[in-house]
Amino acid sequence: MTTFNHVSDLNIPELNDVLMTLPELKTKTFDRTRFYITPEGNHYPSITTVLSIRNKEGLMKWRKRVGDDVANYVSRTAAMRGTKVHHMCEDYLNNENMERHKKEFLPYALFNQLADKALCNIDNIYAQEC
């Protein structure tokens, strides 16, 4: 397993001070849309929300072709799989033991593709989503 170096001192005092005082952002979900809320009360959409705004014509044609029940099942399954892969990536970057994830065959296979092609190019980690 690759071991990632988590850099805690960037040798840039001003940036270190900012990183140490960053508040934890709160989140709210409205109609299945997640927003991050700043201490000033500003709401910013999650990347998933931003990407979901893209043209959905192809997805709507697919949904019409397969029906709502199948489309909902496939969408829900894909979302759960994506969440599992996301957690695996976080654990991997945090140098955690990946053994417990092996029981999730498909998400683990997808994670391994990411690890082999993308995550392997990461060395120093300066900040990470919590």
Feature-to-residue mapping (PLM):
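Metal-dependent nuclease catalytic cores that hydrolyze phosphodiester bonds in DNA/RNA
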Residues: 1-130
